[in-house]
A protein has these predicted regions:
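Hydrophobic small-molecule pocket/channel-lining residues, especially in calycin-type beta-barrels
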Residues: 1-132
């Protein structure tokens, strides 16, 4: 099993604008999302996880335990009830929005990468991050 905890930098992105459109993200925020190169850091503190995403504009942090629902405010302003689960080398995040669209993120880990599939209303984006 590949390690999950670590720091990752965006290397490539496919269909991200279409995914953001499906979420209902406005044009200005989509433009910023397309040009940013986020760094994602996953830290495991004995089962208490911290997911930290850093861009030039904003840093967000989400603390969670696997299988337990947490409140999440997303980068695009949605409030969600979010649950993370682990299936082999995949960390799955399901956002159930209280208003707006819900989404699912599947992060698959290898020794050198994190491959993230983002899904909303049948639209899928693939982003590849390089492990630092």
């Amino acid at each position: 099993m590949a390690p999950i905890a670590g720091k990752y930098v965006l290397e490539s992105s496919e269909n991200f604008d279409e995914f953001m459109k499906a979420l209902g993200v406005g044009m200005m925020l989509r433009k910023l999302g397309q040009t940013s190169k986020p760094t994602v850091e996953l830290i495991d503190n004995n089962g208490e996880w911290n997911l930290k995403t850093t861009t030039t504009l904003k840093t967000t942090e989400l603390k969670f335990k696997l299988g337990q629902e947490v409140d999440e405010s997303t980068f695009d302003g949605r409030d969600c009830k979010t649950v993370f689960t682990l299936e082999g080398d995949k960390l799955i995040q399901v956002q159930n929005a209280t208003k707006g669209k819900s989404a699912k993120y599947t992060r698959e880990f290898t020794d050198s990468q994190m491959i993230m599939l983002s899904e909303c209303d049948g639209v899928v984006s693939k982003r590849i991050y390089k492990r630092q």
